[in-house]
């Protein structure tokens, strides 16, 4: 089992490098197999399609983002609910901009993931939205889940600025802040 996990890690590492250097669309499974120096049957036994590999990479990136939450939240102690959410979103934008190439590929090709991966991705999104939900509950706001879905959607509207126009985290935030206000009233 350890060999299988080791091979999976090698496949994911090689795939990320190939996707980032050549583009997701330009990389095939044969190239991934060659990059890890294994026989095709060994890699195919992992039962990972190219879209599964991408999903695994995105889930790993999300886990890294989630692991940073205690550190992130330690920086957000005071302020109004809007100020806390703004600071939190700006920090998340910085993380996503640091990882923009992989985020771009995930946004374009995430539609091809299986329901299993989409479910895991959604669970991670809920974990990332938890601090905002907590602040809203503490503030006594109603319909917190719907507000969080709205903020998550708005987040990606702002992130498009980074993807398309090379916006900084502050510029992404400035693009959505006027609309963000409506979710905390």
Language model regions located:
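Helix-turn-helix
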Residues: 10, 14, 18-52, 56
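Amphipathic C-terminal alpha-helical segment
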Residues: 94-98, 134, 141-144, 151-171, ...
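Amphipathic alpha-helical packing segments from all-alpha helical-bundle domains
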Residues: 66, 70, 113-140, 145-149, ...
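Hydrophobic alpha-helical connector segments
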Residues: 56, 60, 70-98
């Amino acid at each position: 089992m350890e060999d299988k996990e080791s091979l999976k890690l090698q496949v994911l590492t090689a795939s990320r490098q190939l996707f980032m250097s050549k583009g997701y669309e330009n990389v095939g499974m044969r190239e991934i197999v060659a990059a890890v120096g294994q026989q095709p049957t060994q890699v195919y036994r992992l039962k990972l399609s190219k879209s599964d590999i991408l999903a695994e990479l995105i889930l790993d990136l999300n886990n890294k983002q989630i692991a940073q939450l205690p550190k992130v939240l330690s920086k957000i102690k005071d302020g109004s609910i809007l100020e806390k959410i703004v600071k939190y979103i700006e920090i998340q934008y910085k993380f996503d901009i640091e990882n923009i190439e992989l985020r771009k590929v995930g946004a374009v090709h995430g539609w091809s993931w299986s329901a299993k991966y989409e479910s895991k991705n959604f669970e991670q999104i809920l974990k990332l939205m938890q601090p905002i939900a907590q602040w809203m509950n503490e503030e006594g706001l109603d319909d917190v889940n719907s507000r969080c879905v709205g903020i998550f959607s708005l987040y990606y509207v702002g992130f498009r600025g980074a993807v398309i126009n090379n916006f900084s985290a502050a510029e992404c935030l400035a693009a959505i802040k006027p609309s963000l206000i409506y979710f905390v009233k």
